[in-house]
Amino acid sequence: MFYQYFPYDNESFESSQVKIFSEDGYTFNNLEDKKIIIEPIMDEKLGHRTHTRDPKVWKYKDRYTLILGSKFIESGSDKFTGEVLFYTSEDSENWSYKNRYYDKKIGDMWECPDLFEVDNEYILIMSPEHLISDGNNYTNNTVYSIVGFDEESCDMKIDDEVMILDEGLDLYAAQTNIDKYGNRILIGWMRMPSKPSNEEWIGMMTLPR
C-alpha cells in the first residue's frame, strides 16, 4: 500500500510518500513497517513541501509508475498552480522523478489524481481546489478529462476541458480500481462543507459505481 505520511512538528509538517506491506492485506504495522519512498519536495519550482500527496501506483511492463498531486508558484506569479508529478521505479521502493503536468486554469492544487486507460484512451480524474469561484458553487470539485499520455516518458496533456464528475461535495477524491471481473470500480468520499456540531467526524465512503 502507498500513502502520504506527514509527521507533525509544532503544528507544521512535511509531506512524504511511503510504502507499507501486509501479508494478508488487512493487517499493517504502521509504526515499524512503513518505508519512505519519496522524501518531502524541497524544490519550490517543482512542487510543494507540505501539499504534495495522494499517491496512486500502477505497473507498466516491468516498471512502476506513481502519480502525485501537488502545486507550485510559476515564475512571475503570486498564485499557486495545480499539477501532477510522475515518478517511476523498477522495484516499487526506489523511485525517481520522471515528469510533470500543470495548468494554471484548473484550480490551484490538484488532489487525489487517478490516471487510467479505457478503450485505448487515458482518463484523468482529480479533485482541484478552488476550481470555481463564482460565489454560488463549491470551490472544490471532482473532475475528469480525456488526456494524452505516453507511458514511457510520462508525458501528459489534457486534450479537452475538464468536466465535473458530480456536482457538489457528495463525491470528492474519487479513485478507481479493477475488480476480479475486470470492471473498473469508482469509490469517492461523500462529505459536507463542515462537520456536525455534535460529532468528531465528517463524511463517509460512497457506494461503488
Feature annotation, model-predicted:
Residues 1-54, 59-107, 119-167, 188-209:
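Beta-rich carbohydrate-recognition and catalytic domains
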Residues 50-56, 111-114, 172-175:
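Beta-propeller and closely related beta-sheet repeat lectin domains
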Residues 173, 183, 209:
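Glycine-rich, aromatic-lined ligand/substrate-binding cores of catalytic
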